[in-house]
């Protein structure tokens, strides 16, 4: 790992750190150290990082702003690549928006709404990056990324870069081809918007932001929705009906605002959260015969 670190530093790919605690890079503020943590300063730095990582044949994963992510207390083996500055270009041409994978999704929704472009109102208040949103087909309020992504530019682990069409991305509920078949990083996406009334678009997005703030926990760190909705039922409703709001294990607590959120109420470990997830799963299955599936991505050494 030391030789890998030295080569990354010599290549001047960006920031390179050893044993970086992932708690500093996840929205739930939990997570052990990554063996190596790389934050490329530009697309060439990202491509070079992937090339070097491939050469040493070590495991890797990409993150954005760390939402929808729970890192185990043992940390992450190999290399964590964080997308952000330097991968956040934005081009708007008529109703077509091409944006870097490191661009903030909330910021993008705000910018294009002010341009009178409709289609991303659902993202008002959703944390994370565009790349992460494409990766997991993020959505809310009856819509998701699959409805607006025209194509996505993917850097695959073999070093090739391809534009995949919406169909090739194989979007489904909170997932895409990048989770199912082909490991890669969404470095850019072209979104197809619609022209609309500026005031109506801004109002709709603000309404969604306000709704999230009123119904979801903002006063404690959290990862976002913990469970996928077992449609037509909703995970949060089942958990609330089971009387589990406020249930706590260690520093992990089921939010009293929205039962499908687990918050870090203070000093929580990943193990606290995982124990709470297991307890909720067992309770809901015993009461209702429903097997809840996690939406939050759980990674790291067991």
UniProtKB/Swiss-Prot annotation:
Presence of keyword Flavoprotein: yes
Pathway(s) served: Cell wall biogenesis; peptidoglycan biosynthesis
Reactions the enzyme catalyzes: UDP-N-acetyl-alpha-D-muramate + NADP(+) = UDP-N-acetyl-3-O-(1-carboxyvinyl)-alpha-D-glucosamine + NADPH + H(+)
Active-site annotation: 174, 225 (proton donor), 295
Example GO biological process: regulation of cell shape
Annotated PROSITE patterns: FAD_PCMH
Top EC class, one word: oxidoreductase
Signal peptide: none
Gene3D superfamilies: 3.30.465.10, UDP-N-acetylenolpyruvoylglucosamine reductase, C-terminal domain (3.90.78.10), Uridine Diphospho-n-acetylenolpyruvylglucosamine Reductase, domain 2 (3.30.43.10)
Function (record text): Cell wall formation.
Family label: Belongs to the MurB family.
HAMAP family: MurB
Protein name, as recorded: UDP-N-acetylenolpyruvoylglucosamine reductase
Species this protein is from: Anoxybacillus flavithermus (strain DSM 21510 / WK1)
Gene name in the database record: murB
């Amino acid at each position: 790992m030391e030789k890998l670190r030295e080569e990354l530093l010599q290549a001047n790919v960006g920031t390179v750190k050893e044993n970086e605690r992932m708690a500093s890079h996840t929205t739930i503020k939990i997570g052990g150290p990554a063996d190596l943590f790389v934050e490329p300063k530009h697309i060439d730095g990202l491509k070079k990082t992937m090339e070097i990582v491939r050469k040493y044949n070590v495991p890797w994963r990409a993150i954005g702003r760390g939402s929808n992510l729970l890192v185990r207390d043992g940390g992450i083996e190999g290399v964590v690549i964080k997308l952000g500055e330097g991968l956040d270009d934005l081009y708007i041409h008529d109703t077509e928006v091409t944006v870097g994978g490191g661009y903030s999704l909330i910021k993008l929704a705000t910018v294009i709404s002010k341009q009178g472009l409709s289609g991303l109102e659902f993202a008002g208040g959703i944390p994370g990056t565009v790349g992460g949103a494409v990766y997991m087909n993020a959505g809310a309020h009856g819509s998701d990324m699959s409805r607006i992504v025209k194509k996505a530019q993917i850097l695959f682990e073999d070093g090739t870069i391809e534009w995949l069409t919406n169909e090739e991305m194989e979007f489904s509920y909170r997932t895409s081809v990048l989770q199912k078949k082909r490991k890669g990083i969404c470095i850019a996406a072209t979104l197809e918007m619609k022209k609309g009334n500026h005031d109506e678009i801004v109002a709709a997005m603000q309404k969604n932001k306000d709704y999230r703030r009123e119904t979801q926990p903002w006063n404690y760190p959290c990862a976002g929705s913990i469970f996928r909705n077992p449609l037509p039922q909703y995970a949060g409703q089942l958990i609330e009906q089971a009387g589990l709001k406020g249930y706590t294990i260690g520093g992990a607590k089921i939010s009293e605002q929205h039962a499908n959120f687990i918050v870090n109420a203070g000093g929580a470990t990943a193990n606290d959260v995982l124990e709470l997830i297991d307890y909720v799963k067992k309770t809901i299955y015993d009461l209702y015969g429903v097997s809840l599936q996690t939406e939050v991505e759980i990674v790291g050494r067991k």
